């Protein structure tokens, strides 16, 4: 009987210790929520919430997905409406706000690290107590149309000498050993276009 009691006591102690370790580890796993809101000129808001994010790259990806989805949906919905009745018109500035919330110390530390080390490299972002505010100019044109128009306009306004310099530069970088294009991040390209 005493033997059984001792074994049960040991098992109980082990489980208690395991629970304590797990509770400790929970605080080491970041728990972050981001709330993204876009303020449209017509006064309506569009909000998305992402919870239990665990690393800075995931946070950036969710922010990017949110803005891409909102912009694409807005363009599609606006293009179905006659131009004179559109609430958002070409050239309107659309404001957005992204807030990061933490549920534990690890999350707080990660937000600080994320803000200090990663957000500085994103275009048009300002950090203020875990809140990011920004804007983009609405355009009913697609990325490809914007890009095509920019290239066409650039070519039309360039002199023959400038075009020769550009052609030579392209020839120089189009080599097997060059990884220049691989280094360009799609995320930044999207931001440049918007």
From Swiss-Prot:
Keywords: Glycoprotein, Signal. It comes from Ostreid herpesvirus 1 (isolate France) (OsHV-1). The keyword Glycoprotein applies. This is Uncharacterized protein ORF39. Glycans are attached at residues 31, 72, 133, 157. Residues 1-20 form the signal peptide.
